[in-house]
Amino acid sequence: MKIKKNNVIDCPILIATSDGYLDLLKPFSYLFNEFWSAKQPVTILGYKSPTFGLPSNFTFESLGEQRGIQFWAEDIKKYLCDLKDEYFIYSAEDLFLTRPVNFESLKTLLKFWHTEDFNLARIGLGNTVKNEAHTH
């Protein structure tokens, strides 16, 4: 996976949503195109299609009928298991980009993805993990 011209990467960017949060796709797509690139393809994973247009670099994939929160992870897992790509970037519609993407940091991350001894499960690119209190 490489960063191409216009800050486009050749791996899927998948953004999860649900019917109750479709309106968040408006600010999400605007901020994504502002701070990443309007040339970067993005796939929205949801249930009902939005009733408004998305930017041309965004596509919508329905996960079927929204059956409730208890089935959400199952629906996402089914989609991901059918994905042919080795790598993907996954996020949610309520995690907005709020400043330009640091592509030098992204290049460093991509190097880690390519090392044989690095088994990556998750990297949090936002502040929520470090700023929110956790109780377990």
Please report, for each region that a protein language model flagged, where it lies by residue.
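Short, charged/polar "capping" segments at the starts of alpha-helices
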Residues: 21-25, 48-54, 130-131
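N-proximal low-complexity "stem/linker" segments adjacent to membrane-targeting elements
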Residues: 1-27
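Short, acidic, metal-binding catalytic loop of nucleotide-sugar glycosyltransferases
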Residues: 29-40
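Conserved donor-nucleotide/metal-binding helix-loop-beta segment in metal-dependent transferases, i.e.
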Residues: 99-131
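A conserved mid-domain beta-alpha-beta active-site/ligand-binding segment of alpha/beta enzyme cores
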Residues: 136
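Acidic metal-phosphate-binding loop of nucleotide-sugar-dependent transferases
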Residues: 95-97
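Catalytic metal- and UDP-sugar-binding loop of GT-A-like glycosyltransferases, i.e.
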Residues: 91
